[in-house]
Amino acid sequence: MSKRLYVAYGSNLNIQQMTSRCPGARLYGTGVIENFELQFKGQSHGAYATIAPKDGASVPVAVWEISKRNEQALDRYEGYPSHYFKQDVPVQLDGKEVTAMVYVMNLKMDFGLPAPYYYDVVREGYEDCGLDPAALEQALRESTAQFYGSHWPHQESIFRFESDAEPDEDELEEDDDPDLDEDEPELDETDPFYFSEGMHL
């Protein structure tokens, strides 16, 4: 069975997740892709990781050796070709350069905020692979700034969960109003901007 090298930069850095999705996949090594930056894009409050060209930047990655069946599974998870496209990129890996396939999000997508659970899965993947989390933290800050037009304090509030915190009266009144959700549109899975919950790079 033919094998292919695949670049993970998001939640598929997480070894438990990747081995569950792609049985038999082997961690080939870790390294960087140069002249790209990590970003969070897609849904406004459920964004996923992607990469974009940027001179002088670099993204820490893991390279997996996958089978054709594994690649087909990843295609489904990543919404290929409508949500992500594939391209080959050079990877600097343990003092040598290899070429590997990477998924890149549809360039029409806007910046957004990752869900806390998804961000934690990615962060755990960085730990699994022994990668420096600085690029991940920078991607979160910059994507937040792009989304809000401001800076880090907004994101800190989103990721702070205090069980004893009391909502203010305005929030309680909004939550108690059954009419607020009447005009909320239903998700259409045929829409090219719809993201399935399986998408985790």
Please place each PLM-identified region on the residue numbering.
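Glycine-aromatic micro-motifs
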Residues: 1-201
